């Protein structure tokens, strides 16, 4: 479903935790990271599409989040021709998005990247609100910056921009195989099996590894 200008209606989701850190998902079998997003189906409202995409990409349900705000209007980005299927070139230009800012009220272990048979992400992490966008595919960076800037007014305490040169940090969780941490590339742990907990007094999530708590 395209509008007259060739843009597909879409929703984007910025998901916050209690520390004003944002959820990033690593695209399946790729090296780029992004926020959850997806197209609005015929007959859906942006809010309905947001809740559907939230569940499909993160496993979260409406009771796990609280809507903090949304963008006033559509934000658009164009997709380079090399990423557009040949049959729709000349018609499809890109995405126009309504962005939602959500506060997670559930727990980290409510997140499940395998909620559907067609997952979008194979790892996830929390990161600073104003983290540099180097790990985001280039043609989406401007609209990400616009969405983050517009929605930052809804934060409990304004997140401060950072001049740090590093990109988004590594995924929080070590890979687990047969119950033992492995030294391979980090990936998210199956959320149906474990929760994470940070030691009291830690000032950032990077200072110590999370404790892994196996459910009975």
UniProtKB/Swiss-Prot annotation:
Required cofactor(s): a divalent metal cation
Nudix box, short sequence motif: residues: 38-59
Ranges for domain Nudix hydrolase: 6-149
SUPFAM superfamilies: Nudix
Molecular function per GO: pyrophosphatase activity
Class of enzymatic activity (EC top level): hydrolase
Region (Disordered): 159-180
InterPro entries for this protein: Nudix_hydrolase, NUDIX_hydrolase-like_dom_sf, NUDIX_hydrolase_CS, NUDIX_hydrolase_dom, RppH
E.C. code: 3.6.1.-
Keywords: Hydrolase
PANTHER family: ADP-RIBOSE PYROPHOSPHATASE, DIHYDRONEOPTERIN TRIPHOSPHATE DIPHOSPHATASE
Function: Accelerates the degradation of transcripts by removing pyrophosphate from the 5'-end of triphosphorylated RNA, leading to a more labile monophosphorylated state that can stimulate subsequent ribonuclease cleavage.
Family under the similarity heading: Belongs to the Nudix hydrolase family. RppH subfamily.
Record's protein name: RNA pyrophosphohydrolase
Organism: Burkholderia thailandensis (strain ATCC 700388 / DSM 13276 / CCUG 48851 / CIP 106301 / E264)
Protein encoded by which gene: rppH
């Amino acid at each position: 479903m395209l509008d007259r200008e060739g843009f597909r209606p879409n929703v984007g989701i910025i998901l916050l935790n209690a520390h004003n850190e944002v959820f990033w998902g690593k695209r399946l079998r790729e090296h780029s990271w992004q926020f959850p997003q997806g197209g609005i189906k015929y007959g859906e409202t942006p809010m309905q599409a947001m809740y559907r995409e939230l569940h499909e990409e993160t496993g979260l349900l409406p009771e796990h989040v609280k809507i903090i705000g949304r963008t006033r209007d559509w934000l658009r980005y164009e997709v380079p021709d090399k990423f557009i299927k040949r049959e729709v070139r000349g018609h499809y230009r890109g995405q126009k998005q309504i962005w939602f800012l959500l506060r997670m009220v559930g727990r980290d272990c409510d997140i499940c990247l395998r909620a559907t048979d067609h997952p979008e992400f194979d790892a996830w992490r929390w990161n600073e609100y104003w983290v540099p966008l180097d790990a985001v595919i280039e043609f989406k960076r401007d609209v990400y910056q616009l969405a983050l800037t517009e929605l930052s007014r809804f934060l409990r305490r304004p997140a401060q921009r950072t001049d740090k040169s590093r990109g988004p940090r590594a995924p929080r969780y070590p890979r687990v195989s047969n119950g033992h941490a492995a030294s391979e590339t980090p990936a998210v742990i199956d959320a149906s099996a474990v929760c994470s907990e940070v030691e009291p007094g830690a000032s950032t999530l990077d200072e110590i590894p999370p404790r892994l708590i196996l459910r009975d």
